[in-house]
Amino acid sequence: MSTHLTETWEKAINIIKGELTEVSFNTWIKSINPISLENNSLKLAVPNDFTKGILESRYKDLIVNALKLLTSKKYNIDFIVTTEEKIEKNHNNEKSNIVVNDEMSTMLNPKYTFDSFVIGNSNRFAHAASLAVAESPAKAYNPLFIYGGVGLGKTHLMHAIGHYILHNNPKSQVVYVSSEKFTNELINSIKDDKNVEFRNKYRNIDILLVDDIQFIAGKERTQEEFFHTFNALYEANKQIIISSDRPPKEIPTLEDRLRSRFEWGLIADIQAPDFETRMAILKKKADVEKLNIPNEVMVYIATKIKSNIRELEGALIRIVAFSSLTNKEISVDLASEALKDIISSKQTRQVTIDIIQEVVANYYNLKIEDLKSARRTRNIAFPRQIAMYLSRKLTDMSLPKIGEEFGGRDHTTVIHAYEKISNNLKKDESLQNAINDLNKRINQK
């Protein structure tokens, strides 16, 4: 970067500063860095896509006018997200933790690395297992099956594994694919008579990462093809990593031969983050995105948003945008105003196992203690199974946690209860009515 460009930019932002509130300037303009100036085209580095969008829609003309005032020239402004810039510079031998080896490997998100993953009690085991697999592919745990709710970090860990392996061995053939994309490619290969090419793509590789495997349930041809792909890779001592929103035993209409193979290696779950982890996630996000957020505001967000990381980070960005658009300082009051729709919606649908146990016990004229007891008489065992079924359906609690809430029962007992009620619902109209009634009562709590 030339000294002239640096000096010109510093003068320009001084002009811009006089046109904006301190909040808007610090949030959107301060983080910009000039990259290059060629043929009246100015490239400016920005920290993220969100900032880029705001700058292009609200502040681009302001920047153009400030530069025109200084130089009497009208520049074309091109905002470049810094992460993309780093990837580009990798080809110029700059130090980078991400190695791109071919077209398939570019499916990996450069932001999803082990360094950017925030570790907490809710994901420590899954993180450790993922790192072990990344360090010793096909030697530690094969397959590695990661499951958990939406937005908890499963995809992040899968991409991190891919990046780590490629960093240590750039020649590794790493393929990341969603089960939906796998299915669509299979359909196209059948339609275009390219079965051989399809099989070569997925069987002649070193690492296969398949996201959201639950979506192949009920797709017989996809399951057949994936079964043979799995076998080919496993027998060739290649690493397989799979993610799902539920454990293998709970994926409906999944062939038993696939279910058993998914259970050959290690199964690791990710739970919703606790308060300390939520705070760490927010602080890391603010640091990475160069956002100036008061600590008390992050405490407020972490207290109100508990379900998943995606919503947590989304709340942070929403507050920053709200602050800029209203020209108000970021505070707890502003955060409350910005998130009022999200928080009220969350609060109205928050269901706990305690609520479920209370409603089910009342419905069947039992005590909550009966549902937690060791008694197995039908008048208690059946309502207990219904309560376990509803706990699995309506909460984000893990199977072991649900079992613990019902008198310290094993997670396999919860699975049995869930499967039994699910199967009976298909043919028992009175049970369907009971479940519908219970759902209404739970939602009214």
Swiss-Prot record:
Sorted UniProt keywords: ATP-binding, Cytoplasm, DNA replication, DNA-binding, Lipid-binding, Nucleotide-binding
SMART domains recorded: AAA, Bac_DnaA_C
CDD domains reported in the protein's UniProt record: AAA, Bac_DnaA_C
Residue sites binding ATP per the record: G151, G153, K154, T155
Keyword Cytoplasm assigned: yes
GO biological process, one term: regulation of DNA replication
Gene3D superfamilies: 1.10.1750.10, 1.10.8.60, 3.30.300.180, P-loop containing nucleotide triphosphate hydrolases
Positions of the UniProt region annotated as Domain I, interacts with DnaA modulators: 1-73
Localization in the cell: Cytoplasm
Residue span of region Domain III, AAA+ region: 107-323
GO CC terms, sorted: cytoplasm; plasma membrane
Residues covered by region (Domain II): 73-106
GO molecular function: ATP binding; ATP hydrolysis activity; DNA replication origin binding; lipid binding
Positions of region (Domain IV, binds dsDNA): 324-445
Entry comment, domain topic: Domain I is involved in oligomerization and binding regulators, domain II is flexibile and of varying length in different bacteria, domain III forms the AAA+ region, while domain IV binds dsDNA.
Biological role: Plays an essential role in the initiation and regulation of chromosomal replication. ATP-DnaA binds to the origin of replication (oriC) to initiate formation of the DNA replication initiation complex once per cell cycle. Binds the DnaA box (a 9 base pair repeat at the origin) and separates the double-stranded (ds)DNA. Forms a right-handed helical filament on oriC DNA; dsDNA binds to the exterior of the filament while single-stranded (ss)DNA is stabiized in the filament's interior.
Family: Belongs to the DnaA family.
Subunit structure: Oligomerizes as a right-handed, spiral filament on DNA at oriC.
The name this protein goes by in its record: Chromosomal replication initiator protein DnaA
Species, as recorded: Clostridium botulinum (strain Loch Maree / Type A3)
Lineage: Bacteria, Bacillati, Bacillota, Clostridia, Eubacteriales
